[in-house]
Amino acid sequence: MKLAAFPKCFMDQLVVERSMSLFDWIAMASDLPVEGLEFHHGFLETLDEAYLEGVRSALERRHLQMPMLCASPDFTKPDPEERHREVEREKRLISVTAFLGGSYCRVLSGQRRPEVSREQGALWVVESIRELLDYAAEKGVVLAMENHYKDNYWTHPEFAQRREVYLEILNQIDSPWLGAQYDPSNAILAGEDPIELLELVKRRVVTVHASDRFLKPGHTLEELRSVEDSAGYAAILSHGVVGQGLNNYPRIFRMLREAGYDGWISIEDGINGLGEILESAEFLRPLMQGQVKRPPETPRPRNPQPGG
């Protein structure tokens, strides 16, 4: 397995404010104990070839790979012309992935719009993804459908956030060019068991997000549900250092290895800076190598007395 980093701590600086360039992030990340960097499509200032060539050169100078591009297509838009534009935009990002040397490009279902039924939305999503498969094959890029919560810059949460909808879409498309991007924290946010989801998709996992989200003290999942349909992430939701949250990562990695997974693990962390990404990397590396840390045993008293 190889380790990549995704900088949640710098999302707005890279995407919205543009106070940090992608080249700045590549330089900063070169000191992290990772082999690659996962990019969000919003990190790219332009898709012009000259700019992309500069990005590729910067990665090469720092001996870093760009294995996976985090794209956010929205295939539940009711207007067919808008859905077509989303398909064409995703194709462009597949091409960018290949140009930068990546092998995986994220694909999503889209936003869970109140006016779109489950049946209609699933139909649109399956149709849209199928339109991408031949192009993905041509470029040698596998589409990775994430069990997603919500893009940072969406209004509504993921249409396929719930497991049954996610699997309904994924299982309709039997292609080597579509796999699962597994994120255990997103399953928890959906009110579901991440281990149960992994058991169902483990043979199709092509990329993994390592994250540990948590609700800020005093807040509940029910409260999160009530504020999901607003722009961006809820203020009560936060990322934490991987290994310090609710996910059972030793078990997750054991299941991945048993399924033959040997791909990329991308740290989705660092909300409070690079130090947290480093902590996450130090936690994950032994698990990736098959080393499971066991809790220390509680010392037992010698020669216990009856009733003692």
Q: Which ranges hold each PLM region?
A:
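Conserved beta-strand positions in the central sheet of alpha/beta enzyme cores
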Residues: 38, 68-70, 106, 144, ...
